[in-house]
Curated annotation (Swiss-Prot):
Record GO terms (molecular function): large ribosomal subunit rRNA binding; structural constituent of ribosome
Origin: domain of life: Bacteria
Species name: Zymomonas mobilis subsp. mobilis (strain ATCC 31821 / ZM4 / CP4)
Name of protein: Large ribosomal subunit protein uL11
Gene (name only): rplK
Record Pfam families: Ribosomal_L11, Ribosomal_L11_N
Summary of subunit composition and partner proteins: Part of the ribosomal stalk of the 50S ribosomal subunit. Interacts with L10 and the large rRNA to form the base of the stalk. L10 forms an elongated spine to which L12 dimers bind in a sequential fashion forming a multimeric L10(L12)X complex.
GO BP, one annotated term: translation
Length: 143
């Protein structure tokens, strides 16, 4: 018989840097999950990623206080900023341009993010990423 699920916890955890301090500790402690066990398992699973990369993680908590977790790809905003070495997006998107990004870089990000996106093909995923880039105040250029 399947375990009874008592809840889900959504967190953005830096790859390889999960520790019991806030926000991870209190969120897991409220549900009675063994915090150190999660931290060790998460750090082991995210070992291949670049340290510090934020990973959206969904933790499923079961009635017997055990857990399972699933990590997704980093957020699009993080990938866009990393692609053009930007600290933050534009303060006034649509008016002020924070930077320029090539369409080839956007296609690369779309391929990386494809499993998490609600798109049927890379072309649709590329349009989603382009929209995110424009919303951050980035100008999409050919290339």
């Amino acid at each position: 018989m399947a375990k009874k699920i008592t809840g889900y916890i959504k967190l953005q955890v830096p790859a390889g840097k999960a520790n019991p301090s806030p926000p991870i500790g209190p969120a897991l402690g409220q549900r009675g999950v063994n915090i150190m066990e999660f931290c060790k398992a998460f750090n082991a699973k995210s070992q291949g990623m670049e340290p510090g990369t934020p990973l959206p993680t969904i933790i499923t908590v079961y009635a017997d206080r055990s857990f399972s977790f699933e990590s997704k790809m980093p957020p699009v905003s993080y990938l866009l900023k990393k692609a053009i070495n930007l600290k933050s997006g534009s303060k006034e998107p649509g008016k002020a341009v924070a930077g320029k990004i090539k369409r080839s870089q956007i296609v690369e990000i779309a391929n990386t993010k494809m499993p998490d996106l609600n798109a049927n093909d890379v072309e649709a995923a590329t349009r989603i990423i382009e929209g995110s880039a424009r919303a951050m105040g980035l100008e999409v250029v050919e290339g």
